[in-house]
Swiss-Prot record:
Gene Ontology molecular function: tryptophan synthase activity
Organism whose genome encodes this protein: Schizosaccharomyces pombe (strain 972 / ATCC 24843)
Lineage: Eukaryota, Fungi, Dikarya, Ascomycota, Taphrinomycotina
Catalytic activity: (1S,2R)-1-C-(indol-3-yl)glycerol 3-phosphate + L-serine = D-glyceraldehyde 3-phosphate + L-tryptophan + H2O
Enzyme Commission number, as recorded: 4.2.1.20
Keyword Lipid metabolism: no
Name used for this protein in its record: Tryptophan synthase
Pathway where it operates: Amino-acid biosynthesis; L-tryptophan biosynthesis; L-tryptophan from chorismate: step 5/5
Length: 697
C-alpha cells in the first residue's frame, strides 16, 4: 500500500509532473455520489485521493470542510461506512492511492489495529491523522508499518528544525506540508504564501528525497503550478468541496473532473474558466518566523493514561513555547509575587463561611462554603485569568481570546484584558449568548468583543472549537486564555496551578477554624477548573473524600445530560485524551444542562485520572436536583449561587445527610447566580412542580 504511493510520486517525477492530491469527504453529498466523485477525480488527473473521515469537532478545518462533515454526518457516515465506500470505489474502478484523512477519536474508538487492518483489507493506502502527532502515534505507526500502510506526517510553517527532523524521520511515503498557518480553506483572494519556497527548502534539508505535497490555499491552475514548482505534489481540498456544494444534483463528478483537468493544464496563463475563478494574483509576504527549538517538555504531559498533546502540527510549537514560559514562571518567585500582588483586586483570599442553617436542615455533617462567588467578577475564573494574562505578557502577546459557556470566564477574561490593556475577543455559543444575555452585555461593557458561535449545538463545545481555530490563525500576536482544565498540555496544568489557590486556602482556613482537614470537599464538574482547583491540594490527603457533581440534565437514562465522568468513555477530544461523551462511532455526543457552564462533553485529564484510580467520586445531579440546591442556599443562607455551583450544593447536602455530625464538608460556591435568574425563571414552570417550588405571581 505504501509502495503504491511511492510509485505514484516516482512516476510523476519521471514525467516531470506534480502529483495532484485531492480531498473529498466520505458520504458528501452522499455515498453514491462520493464514489462517482472519486471516479471523476481520477479521470481528471488526480494521482492520490484523500478520503475524509467526517468528524463533528474538526478544530483545524475551515467552514467549507466543516460543512462537508456536517452533511456526511447527517448521512450517518461512520468509520465502518468509510471502509465500505473505499471497497465500493475500488470495485468501481478507482485504482489510484486512497489515503484516509481525519481526526483520531473515531479511529481510537474503533481500535488502532482493527482500523489499520480493515483499511488494508478494503484497499486504502494510508492515513493522515490531523491531531495525532508522532509522539502520540508510536503504536499506530508500528501497526501501519507492520501492515505496509503509510502514515503521513504534517509539517507547518511554525515547525522547528528539531521537530522537522523528527517528522521527516517517520515519513514512509511523503510529507504533507501545510503552506500557511490557519484552518483549511481555498485561497479565495488568490493569496499563496510566498515564503513557501523557503519552507519547502527547510523541509527538504531533513526529508532528503522523500516527496513533499503542499496544501492549504490552492485554488487556481496558477496556484497549482506555482506551488508545484517547489514541491512534488499539490493538495486541493476546500475548493473541491466548495464546487461540490454548488454543483447541481448528480453533476458533481463531472464538475470535479473538469476542475482537475483545469488545474493540471500545461499552460496556467490561459484564461481561467468562470466557475473556477478566484479573486486575484499571488501576494507577497515576508518569510514566516521560526521560533527557536525548545530542548524538551519540562513538565509531565499526562496524568496516568490521560492528557497529552493531540493537536494539529500548527499548534505544537506554540504549546511548547507556552509550556516553557509557564515552567520558568512556576519557578520564578518574582512571578508569584506579581500574581499575589493582585489578590486585593481579585478579592482573595475568599471567605470560608459556616452554613449553619443549611447544616441544621441537612441534619448531618457541618457544611462550609468556599465563597469564590465573592471574587471580583463573581466567580473563581479570575484566579486563572490573572495568572494567564501574566503569562501572555511574558510571551509578548497583546491580544487575548477565550471561550465561555455561562459567561463567567468571559467576564473574568474581559476584566483582566481591560486591567492590562489588551485587546480581547470572547467566543460564545449562540444559545449560551441567549440564555446568558446579561453576561454578554457585561463582557461588552468591559470593552471586549463577543463572537456568537452558530455552528453545532451553539454551546461551550462549539465556542472552544472556534477559539482554537482563531488561535491558529493569529498565533503570533494572540494568547488563547482557556477557561477550564481541558485541552492539550500544558493548559490543564496551567489552569490547575492557578486555581489550586481554592484548595490551598481551604486547607489553611479549615486548620484555623476546625484544627483539622475537612472530611470531604465538594465541587461541580464541567471542564473542571473549580473542581481540580479544590481537589488538587487534597490529592495526597487520603482521609479527605473528593466529590464531583456533574450535570445530570434530564437524567443519565436519557441522552440529555452532560455527565461525562459518569457516562462517558475514554477518547480524544479538544487535544487531550480523557473521558468523553461520545457515540459508539466516536462522534462527539450532544449535551444538555440547565447550566451553560457545565454543558460540555469532555473533562480535564486530571479529573479523569481521579475517577480512573477511584481517588474521587463523581455523581450526576439532574436539572431538578440542581434547582433544589439553588433554592436551599437561597432560602437558608441568603446566597444566590450560580447554577453550576448549585449542582455541588445539592451533592454536598446529600453527602452531609449521610455523615455524622462531627464531620466537616466544604462545598465550592464557584460563582454567583445573578446571571442565572432569568434561566431559573424560564425553567421553574417546567421543573418547579417536580420539586414543589412555585414562584408564579
Amino acid at each position: 500500500m505504501t509502495e503504491q504511493i511511492k510509485k505514484t510520486f516516482l512516476k510523476a517525477k519521471e514525467e516531470n509532473k506534480n502529483v495532484l492530491v485531492t480531498f473529498v469527504t466520505c458520504g458528501f453529498p452522499n455515498v453514491d455520489e462520493t464514489i462517482k466523485i472519486m471516479q471523476g477525480l481520477q479521470n481528471g488527473g488526480a494521482g492520490i485521493i484523500e478520503l475524509g473521515i467526517p468528524f463533528s469537532d474538526a478544530v483545524a478545518d475551515g467552514p467549507t470542510i466543516c460543512k462537508g462533515n456536517e452533511i456526511a454526518l447527517k448521512n450517518n457516515i461512520t468509520l465502518e461506512k468509510v471502509f465500505e465506500t473505499v471497497k465500493l470505489a475500488r470495485d468501481a474502478g478507482v485504482t489510484i492511492p486512497i489515503i484516509l484523512m481525519g481526526y483520531y477519536n473515531p479511529i481510537f474508538s474503533y481500535g488502532d489495529a482493527k482500523t489499520i487492518q480493515k483499511a488494508k483489507e478494503v484497499g486504502a493506502n494510508g492515513f493522515i491523522i490531523v491531531d495525532l502527532p508522532p509522539e502520540e502515534a508510536v503504536g499506530f505507526r508500528e501497526e501501519c508499518k507492520k501492515q505496509g500502510v503509510s502514515f503521513v506526517p504534517l509539517v507547518a510553517p511554525s515547525t522547528t528544525d528539531r521537530r522537522m527532523e523528527l517528522l521527516a524521520s517517520v515519513a514512509d511515503s511523503f510529507i504533507y506540508v501545510v503552506s500557511r498557518m490557519g484552518s483549511t480553506g481555498s485561497s479565495a483572494t488568490g493569496v499563496i504564501n510566498t515564503a513557501l519556497p523557503q519552507l519547502c527548502q527547510r523541509v527538504r534539508k531533513f526529508a532528503g528525497d522523500t516527496p513533499l505535497a503542499v496544501g492549504f490555499g490552492v485554488n487556481t491552475s496558477e496556484h497549482f503550478h506555482q506551488v508545484g514548482s517547489v514541491s512534488d505534489g499539490v493538495v486541493v481540498g476546500s475548493k473541491i468541496i466548495d464546487l461540490i456544494l454548488k454543483a447541481e444534483p448528480g453533476t458533481a463528478a463531472t464538475v470535479v473532473e473538469e476542475y482537475c483537468k483545469y488545474l493540471t493544464k500545461e499552460d496556467p496563463s490561459a484564461p481561467v474558466p468562470k466557475q473556477f475563478q478566484s479573486g486575484g494574483s499571488v501576494a507577497t509576504a515576508p518569510p514566516a518566523a521560526v521560533v527557536e527549538p525548545i530542548n524538551e517538555m519540562y513538565l509531565p504531559q499526562k496524568y496516568g493514561m490521560f492528557g497529552g498533546m493531540y493537536v494539529p502540527e500548527a499548534l505544537t510549537q506554540c504549546l511548547v513555547e507556552l509550556e516553557s514560559v509557564f515552567y520558568k514562571a512556576l519557578h520564578d518567585e518574582k512571578f508569584w509575587e506579581e500574581f499575589r500582588s493582585y489578590y486585593e483586586y481579585m478579592g482573595r483570599p475568599s471567605a470560608l463561611d459556616y452554613a449553619k442553617r443549611l447544616t441544621e436542615y441537612c441534619g448531618g455533617a457541618h457544611i462550609w462554603l468556599k465563597r469564590e462567588d465573592l471574587n471580583h467578577g463573581g466567580s473563581h475564573k479570575i484566579n486563572n485569568c490573572i495568572g494567564q494574562i501574566l503569562l501572555a505578557k511574558r510571551l509578548g502577546k497583546n491580544r487575548i481570546i477565550a471561550e465561555t459557556g455561562a459567561g463567567q470566564h468571559g467576564v473574568a477574561t474581559a476584566i483582566c484584558a481591560a486591567k492590562f490593556g489588551m485587546k480581547c475577543t470572547i467566543y460564545m455559543g449562540a444559545e449560551d449568548c441567549r440564555r446568558q444575555a446579561l453576561n454578554v452585555f457585561r463582557i461588552r461593557l468591559l470593552g471586549a468583543e463577543v463572537v456568537p458561535v452558530t455552528s453545532g449545538t451553539q454551546t461551550l463545545r462549539d465556542a472552544v472549537n472556534e477559539a482554537l481555530k482563531a488561535w491558529v490563525e493569529q498565533i503570533d500576536t494572540t494568547h488563547y486564555l482557556i477557561g477550564s482544565a481541558i485541552g492539550p498540555h500544558p493548559f490543564p496544568t496551567i489552569v490547575k496551578t492557578f486555581q489550586s489557590v481554592i484548595g490551598e486556602e481551604t486547607k489553611a482556613q479549615m486548620q484555623e477554624k476546625r484544627k483539622k482537614l475537612p472530611d470531604a470537599v465538594v465541587a461541580c464538574v464541567g471542564g473542571g477548573s473549580n473542581s481540580i482547583g479544590m481537589f488538587s491540594p487534597f490529592k495526597a490527603d487520603k482521609s479527605v473524600m473528593m466529590l464531583g457533581c456533574e450535570a445530570g440534565g434530564d437524567g443519565v437514562d436519557t441522552p440529555k445530560h452532560s455527565a461525562t465522568l459518569t457516562m462517558g468513555k475514554v477518547g480524544v477530544f479538544h487535544g487531550v485524551r480523557t473521558y468523553v461523551l461520545q457515540r459508539e462511532d466516536g462522534q462527539i455526543q450532544d449535551t444538555h444542562s440547565i447550566s451553560a457552564g457545565l454543558d460540555y462533553p469532555g473533562v480535564g485529564p486530571e479529573l479523569s485520572e481521579l475517577k480512573y484510580t477511584n481517588r474521587a467520586e463523581f455523581i450526576a445531579v439532574t436539572d431538578a436536583q440542581c434547582l433544589e440546591g439553588f433554592r436551599a442556599l437561597c432560602h437558608l443562607e441568603g446566597i444566590i449561587p450560580a447554577l453550576e455551583s448549585s449542582h455541588a450544593v445539592y451533592g454536598g447536602m446529600e453527602l452531609a445527610k449521610k455523615l455524622p455530625k462531627d464531620k466537616d464538608i466544604v462545598i465550592t460556591i464557584s460563582g454567583r447566580g445573578d446571571k442565572d435568574v432569568q434561566s431559573v425563571a424560564e425553567q421553574l414552570p417546567i421543573l418547579g412542580p417536580k420539586i414543589g417550588w412555585d414562584l408564579r405571581f
